[in-house]
Amino acid sequence: MIAKNIYEMLQDVCSRNKDSIFFVRQNETYADLLKKVKQRAVLLAQRFGIKKGDTVAILSGNTPDFLRSYFAITSLGARALMLDTGLNTNEHINMMKRTDCKLVMAQQSLFIDDAPCPMFDIENIDDTDENEFTMAQTERSDIAQLSFTS
């Protein structure tokens, strides 16, 4: 099967490796990963109204929550704006404004007081019903990720 989008690729990998360990420290399997991605996507859609074409930033270190968030954002057809933790606050704010960012999923220690959109703790995800998840219909030409370079 050739995946049409990032979420279908994830779904395929998780279904073929569902009992394999994805994250050793938390003994999390690929099946657990897929469930958490769906839960996070439901939260983004229901609590924040995130939908296809919106931009959601991620400001986090290299953690499982970063990956869960990335896959959740793209599964909704939204664009993930990657914010480099090594850049300064003004640069982050500029990127958020230029991309019409709707939400920032960030580690709480990296929250920005003057952010032009809401900040949400990337590690503080409530349990939502993953059965309410609906994958967005996307095209190969849809943008999944935004990155700024120097």
What are the residue ranges of the model-derived segments?
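A short N-terminal helical cap/helix-turn-helix that marks the beginning
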Residues: 1-21, 144
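Short, Lys/Arg-enriched, disordered terminal segments
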Residues: 1-4, 47, 129-131
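Conserved S/T- and glycine-rich ATP-binding loop of Class I adenylate-forming
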Residues: 56, 73, 104, 143, ...
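Conserved AMP-binding/adenylate-forming core of the ANL superfamily
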Residues: 11, 19-50, 55-63, 67-71, ...
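Conserved pre-ATP/AMP-binding loop-to-beta segment of ANL
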Residues: 19-21, 130-148
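Structural core segment of the AMP-binding/adenylate-forming
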Residues: 68, 75-139
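Helix N-cap/beta->alpha junction signal
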Residues: 60-62, 107-108, 142
